[in-house]
């Protein structure tokens, strides 16, 4: 309480309603062009949040844990939390996961913007608290910081807070989310030569995409390439196919051979190369990495938003009303069960989860 009272006094900006409206319009126009400047979003939230914050305050007053939070006004700042100690906690605690998230994405808990334009101490604290708890939301819902993951978390926050700025973020996010994304996923550490010109970018793809570059770059031996003239005798191709697998480790015995139209039941790919009017056999070598290709905007609209809405509705208490600081040394799964928090489904983890 004492810490926030000082923070409130040092950050309060006393301006009239007309000036606030002017700031709101200017920030809204600039947010789309510079979304990384989070203070713009914070200022717009400050000015537009009075009715929503009042409702949050009334909810917290009528909730035992919420009243405790309002009375003590805990903060995720260095003066109140020993962040280095959180890294020493067991790996499945909320505090450890929180620090791991911050370090993974190079974030700092104390960097969240303080509310500037509320004259009421409690209202100012509620909005400041909402911003500080935002990263806790990433952790407990298992969301990374991509545009689509941020948008999904904003939908959860809209359900829980009714803040207008969260609705704006949800509406704008699909236009800012990439249509298509290529992402290298490494099983181990990032190879030192990843950015070098001679790095072998072929991969084993979990979604069975064909690496188009590897079809063309014969000189780099990225794939085995096989050709035969087209024949109508199906038995010929059956024998050819068997011959290849009998000599799978002896490429000199099969190089210069191709299989046309034979049903492929292996983990390799047979595709039809339209320009050359021929079938190509691609030998997929096991790699320590894969190129993951997906459509973030489509995933956001069809999967992340529906999940986020249901996750927001099912949670029994908004995060800002929970005394998070008392849970930092507790098991994160226990925290989720206590408040019925549904983390990101496994099938969306590679696209939107914390990796």
UniProtKB/Swiss-Prot annotation:
GO CC field: extrinsic component of mitochondrial inner membrane
Single GO biological process annotation from the record: ubiquinone biosynthetic process
Keyword terms: Lyase, Membrane, Metal-binding, Mitochondrion, Mitochondrion inner membrane, Ubiquinone biosynthesis, Zinc
Cofactor field: Zn(2+)
Chief localization: mitochondrion
Pfam families listed in its UniProt record: Coq4
Coiled coil ranges: none
Enzyme class (EC, first level): lyase
Pathway field: Cofactor biosynthesis; ubiquinone biosynthesis
Protein EC: 4.1.1.130
Subunit structure: Component of a multi-subunit COQ enzyme complex.
Additional record remark: This protein may be expected to contain an N-terminal transit peptide but none has been predicted.
Function comment: Lyase that catalyzes the C1-decarboxylation of 4-hydroxy-3-methoxy-5-(all-trans-polyprenyl)benzoic acid into 2-methoxy-6-(all-trans-polyprenyl)phenol during ubiquinone biosynthesis.
Identification of the protein by name: Ubiquinone biosynthesis protein COQ4 homolog, mitochondrial
Species, as recorded: Plasmodium vivax (strain Salvador I)
Lineage of source species: Eukaryota, Sar, Alveolata, Apicomplexa, Aconoidasida
């Amino acid at each position: 309480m004492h810490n926030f009272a000082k923070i409130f006094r040092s950050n309060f900006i006393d301006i009239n309603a007309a000036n606030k409206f002017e700031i709101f319009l200017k920030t809204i126009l600039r947010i789309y062009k510079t979304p990384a400047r989070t203070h713009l979003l914070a200022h717009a939230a400050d000015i537009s949040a009075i009715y929503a914050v009042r409702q949050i305050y009334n909810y917290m007053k009528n909730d035992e844990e919420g009243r405790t939070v309002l009375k003590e006004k805990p903060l995720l700042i260095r003066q109140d939390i020993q962040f280095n100690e959180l890294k020493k906690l067991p790996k499945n605690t909320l505090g450890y996961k929180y620090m791991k998230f911050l370090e993974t994405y190079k974030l700092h808990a104390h960097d969240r913007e303080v509310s500037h334009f509320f004259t009421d101490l409690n209202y100012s604290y509620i909005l400041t608290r909402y911003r500080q708890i935002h990263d806790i939301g990433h952790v407990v819902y298992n969301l990374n910081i991509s545009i689509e993951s941020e948008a999904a978390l904003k939908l959860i926050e809209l359900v829980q807070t009714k803040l207008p700025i969260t609705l704006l973020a949800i509406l704008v996010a699909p236009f800012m989310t990439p249509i298509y994304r290529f992402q290298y996923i490494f099983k181990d550490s990032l190879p030192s030569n990843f950015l070098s010109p001679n790095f072998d970018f072929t991969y084993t793809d979990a979604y069975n995409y064909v690496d188009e570059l590897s079809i063309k770059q014969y000189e780099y031996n990225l794939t085995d390439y096989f050709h035969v003239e087209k024949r109508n005798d199906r038995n010929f191709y059956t024998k050819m196919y068997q011959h290849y697998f009998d000599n799978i480790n002896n490429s000199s015995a099969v190089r210069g051979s191709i299989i046309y139209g034979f049903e492929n039941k292996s983990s390799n790919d047979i595709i039809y190369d339209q320009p050359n009017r021929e079938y190509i056999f691609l030998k997929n070598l096991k790699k320590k990495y894969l190129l993951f290709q997906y459509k973030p905007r489509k995933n956001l609209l069809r999967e992340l938003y529906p999940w986020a809405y249901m996750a927001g509705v099912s949670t029994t208490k908004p995060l800002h009303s929970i005394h998070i600081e008392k849970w930092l040394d507790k098991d994160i799964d226990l925290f989720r069960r206590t408040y019925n928090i549904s983390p990101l489904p496994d099938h969306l983890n590679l696209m939107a989860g914390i990796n």
